[in-house]
């Protein structure tokens, strides 16, 4: 889908709605895993998910950052109309994907070091070790899926993956229920189900691309890829990866602080995070749309469309954030019972609901989701990294000041502080770039 011409409401909706729907279904994976674990296993298993969330955030954010960057480069290549440029960009991205998969396998072998880094409580480590090993070893399946997804997004094709995400949710549900509910497996089975589901989606995406978009899979030999392409991908993906890594580092610092609290509170955070991630998913995909649209218009040399589309994305962002906040405050107890189960102790569900009600208040104003993607597509890599540094600093303040003084509520206030501060800085940086007409490279 081409966003370099005049604004078309129908085309915009056809691109955006499937994109948000697909991400919602993707996030249902984590919610289902949490719900099944909460229903079928004890609070210790739920605490393992919560305690490991900081480490898994690092893995997930590094992968997401690289592939967001790859998607921007692919979108810029598509916008340029240069077939050879598109082929060499995809080829380089494919080779980077293989390297990232290998790094995930290596990280899985060092699981004891990972648990030390994450400050995993000793009583949780026997169950946490296989859970982390499977999660990191499955990075290759996640990477293959993400590469094919951003390749489709670069040409504006979001419909198929939206439908495929429904199948993925069903497959993940069946596997989790089978492994944990029927076969009585441990918490590691939740990670295994997610890895298998991602592998299935990657295979189906590859089949679709071979049928409908075979030209997108054209590759070039390693020697035929210019050094500038390697560097542009590394710079683009690396900037977002560094940003995401800094955000994940902040999450890890915050999680280390939370892991000093009672196991029931660690479990409460796991419940709250599963709902928070699902609720903010549509807004996250507005950020993806910002990257795709900005990247295409940078490639086409049409900067005016960037502002036109960005204004529309901002309005949608506020509306979705207010809707999520209203949902949590009005029917939050019912949502919590649905995920945790009616028999879950209020020592877990009560703090989880309070945490969610505090953090959701910042949803309508978390504009950094939009700004960081637009800045990256405009080649403002320093600004992207600066946003990440700010979030780490805010998380450190939370872990070292707010949590020791306010307990579990301090961790929720830390999220509000981090997201709010990065939104303010992101707005300043974006307006400066657009007002100054800073040049950007495709």
Task: Please report, for each region that a protein language model flagged, where it lies by residue.
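Helix-loop interface residues and adjacent transmembrane-helix termini in multi-pass membrane transporters
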Residues: 31, 40-43, 77-80, 154-155, ...
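Short alpha-helical transmembrane segments in multi-pass integral membrane proteins
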Residues: 1-16, 74-140, 174, 180-238, ...
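Alpha-helical transmembrane segments of multipass membrane proteins
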Residues: 31-35, 113, 147-151, 173-178, ...
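Short runs within selected transmembrane alpha-helices of multi-pass transporters and secretion channels
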Residues: 67, 134-153, 161-172, 190-205, ...
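Transmembrane helix-bundle signature of multi-pass secondary active exporters and lipid flippases
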Residues: 19-72, 135-142, 231, 237-296, ...
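Small-residue-rich hydrophobic transmembrane alpha-helices
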Residues: 46-105, 109, 142-161, 268-327, ...
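Non-cytoplasmic
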Residues: 31-34, 333-334, 379
């Amino acid at each position: 889908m081409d966003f370099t011409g005049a604004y078309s409401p129908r085309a915009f909706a056809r691109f955006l709605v499937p994109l948000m729907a697909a991400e919602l279904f993707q996030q249902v994976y984590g919610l289902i895993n949490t719900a099944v674990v909460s229903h079928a296993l004890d609070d210790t298993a739920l605490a393992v998910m919560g305690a490991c969330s900081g480490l898994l955030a690092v893995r997930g954010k590094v992968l997401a950052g690289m592939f967001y960057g790859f998607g921007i480069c692919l979108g810029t290549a598509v916008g340029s109309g240069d077939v050879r440029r598109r082929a060499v960009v995809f080829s380089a991205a494919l080779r980077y994907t293989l390297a990232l998969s290998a790094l995930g396998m290596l990280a899985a072998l060092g699981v004891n070091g990972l648990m030390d880094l994450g400050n995993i409580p000793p009583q949780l480590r026997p169950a946490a070790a296989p859970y982390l090993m499977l999660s990191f070893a499955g990075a290759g399946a996640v990477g293959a899926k993400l590469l094919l997804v951003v390749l489709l997004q670069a040409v504006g094709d979001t419909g198929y993956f939206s439908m495929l995400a429904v199948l993925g949710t069903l497959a993940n549900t069946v596997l989790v229920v089978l492994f944990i509910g029927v076969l009585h497996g441990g918490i590691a089975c939740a990670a295994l189900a997610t890895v298998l589901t991602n592998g299935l989606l990657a295979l189906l995406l590859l089949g679709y691309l071979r049928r409908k978009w075979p030209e997108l899979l054209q590759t070039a030999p390693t020697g035929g890829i210019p050094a500038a392409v390697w560097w542009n991908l590394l710079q683009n993906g690396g900037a977002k990866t560094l940003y995401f890594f800094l955000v994940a580092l902040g999450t890890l610092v915050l999680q280390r602080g939370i892991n000093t609290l009672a196991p029931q509170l660690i479990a409460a955070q796991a419940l709250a995070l599963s709902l928070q991630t699902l609720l903010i998913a549509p807004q996250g995909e507005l950020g993806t749309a910002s990257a795709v649209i900005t990247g295409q218009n940078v490639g086409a040399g049409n900067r005016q469309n960037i502002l036109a589309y960005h204004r529309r994305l901002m309005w949608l962002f506020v509306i979705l954030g207010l809707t999520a906040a209203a949902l949590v405050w009005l029917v939050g107890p019912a949502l919590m019972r649905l995920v945790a189960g009616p028999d879950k102790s209020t020592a877990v569900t009560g703090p989880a609901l309070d945490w969610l009600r505090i953090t959701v208040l910042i949803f309508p104003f978390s504009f950094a989701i939009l700004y960081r993607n637009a800045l990256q597509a405009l080649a403002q890599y320093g600004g992207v990294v600066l946003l990440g540094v700010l979030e780490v600093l805010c998380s450190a303040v939370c872990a070292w000041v707010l949590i020791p003084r306010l307990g579990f509520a301090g961790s929720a206030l830390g999220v509000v502080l981090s997201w709010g501060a990065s939104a303010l800085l992101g707005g300043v940086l974006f307006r400066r770039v657009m007002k100054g007409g800073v040049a950007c490279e495709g």
